[in-house]
């Protein structure tokens, strides 16, 4: 019996361990800065002042448009959602059946058991009522800034950018990550772009440490709130 209990506890611990979300880790290779590939040195030509890959028009600005260039994204995200639903379903039914004649003869006759007449009649009635009310609301806000690098330049000139910022505090670490697509026309002269102009944005704000752990429910609470709980 003790062996069966130990095996059961180990199985429950394994299932609950799979419900735990792994904390974010620093130095994710996907969000690492992307550096431009250094071209192989060409043969020296005396008097040459042109270097392939680093040309710039006389009237161009210094906005980012190459792999490895730096862009500052201004975070100004606000989302608000609400939903409310009401339902009320009612149904009443009533059925009444009475037989007064059969093959042309009356169905009413003297009752040999007691007084009164016999009558083959039936009556049925029923009602059902179902009501439901649900309401949900959510609001989020994120402001700040993060500097990222250009990871890829698409054939149509769209810049694929990504990057992360880790801040180490006394009680843990705070993480901000972002990845998405930016038009070169949306970049300001100081190489900044608002987050609302980032297409296909993937923004993550998370952390590790005492504050992050305190805001998470315990493993037993997660079990009761998970789909594994049968009730």
UniProtKB/Swiss-Prot annotation:
Membrane topology: Lipid-anchor
Keyword field contains Signal: yes
Compartments, record wording: Cell outer membrane; Bacterial flagellum basal body
Lipid addition sites, S-diacylglycerol cysteine: 19
Ranges for region Disordered: 118-141
Predominant localisation class: membrane
Gene Ontology molecular functions: cytoskeletal motor activity
Keywords: Bacterial flagellum, Cell outer membrane, Lipoprotein, Membrane, Palmitate, Signal
Lipidation (N-palmitoyl cysteine): 19
Biological process, per Gene Ontology: bacterial-type flagellum-dependent cell motility
Signal sequence coordinates: 1-18
Tree of life domain: Bacteria
Pfam families tied to this protein: FlgH (PF02107)
Role description: Assembles around the rod to form the L-ring and probably protects the motor/basal body from shearing forces during rotation.
HAMAP family, sorted: FlgH (MF_00415)
Similarity comment: family membership: Belongs to the FlgH family.
Name listed for the protein in its UniProt record: Flagellar L-ring protein
